[in-house]
């Protein structure tokens, strides 16, 4: 049984997502925590990852150097910042390690680096690893094809005060899903802010609104508004554990993949629906 397990390295082990990932890894069948990493200079270096996550000693010591744990993991799970993730990507590409990437806020060059690396290693890259969010994206695709051409489309998202990028990666994924269903490019139809005398709403655009407040884990709504009616599709996360479980489910799914770039729709088989 042990030989069949996937060993995961968790980057950002001391962060909110990192601790959830450690907890989830201990309870998910087929997953073995292999390594835990934090940035150089962190006060958490040398700590036991299990104690850090509040689950007791597990014998995995928090390190800062991937090279020291190269032989301890099969899949690296990364929910950090773009600059750090790209450095980890280069390491994994060099050493043939698969990756699950939940980091958001990449520019186009960063996204291209991920696409390039996926020619050699297997990567699941998703804006959101919640099963519910990815089901929502499928619903948005279907709704956009039916209502999108004659409704006003708005995306509203809310997150905690510590989130540093806006709109959220999930909100952008929602916009891209809707735009693609309407044979549009999101860059050509997105409206990210409104202030002052804006004039009437431009038909065919997709608006975005962002809230940053308190400890909101994540709330996303897409509104399709027509005269006399509107459809709203909403997802609300109440625990980060849903993202952690989805990420580790992705790591298990990568077991049979040699290379390629995938997302949660692939992991969940949503494209066949």
UniProtKB/Swiss-Prot annotation:
The protein's annotated pathway: Amino-acid biosynthesis; L-lysine biosynthesis via DAP pathway; (S)-tetrahydrodipicolinate from L-aspartate: step 4/4
Subcellular localization(s) per the UniProt record: Cytoplasm
GO molecular function: 4-hydroxy-tetrahydrodipicolinate reductase; NAD binding; NADP binding; oxidoreductase activity, acting on CH or CH2 groups, NAD or NADP as acceptor
Main location group: cytoplasm
Keyword field: Amino-acid biosynthesis, Cytoplasm, Diaminopimelate biosynthesis, Lysine biosynthesis, NAD, NADP, Oxidoreductase
Residues noted as binding NAD(+) in the record, renumbered to the chain: 12-17, 38, 102-104, 126-129
Gene Ontology BP annotations: diaminopimelate biosynthetic process; lysine biosynthetic process via diaminopimelate
Keyword Plastid part of the UniProt annotation: no
First-tier enzyme category under EC: oxidoreductase
Active site (UniProt): 159, 163
Enzyme Commission (EC) number: 1.17.1.8
Substrates-to-products reaction catalysed: (S)-2,3,4,5-tetrahydrodipicolinate + NAD(+) + H2O = (2S,4S)-4-hydroxy-2,3,4,5-tetrahydrodipicolinate + NADH + H(+); (S)-2,3,4,5-tetrahydrodipicolinate + NADP(+) + H2O = (2S,4S)-4-hydroxy-2,3,4,5-tetrahydrodipicolinate + NADPH + H(+)
Family: Belongs to the DapB family.
HAMAP family listed in its UniProt record: DapB
Functional summary from the UniProt entry: Catalyzes the conversion of 4-hydroxy-tetrahydrodipicolinate (HTPA) to tetrahydrodipicolinate.
Name listed for the protein in its UniProt record: 4-hydroxy-tetrahydrodipicolinate reductase
Organism: Salmonella arizonae (strain ATCC BAA-731 / CDC346-86 / RSK2980)
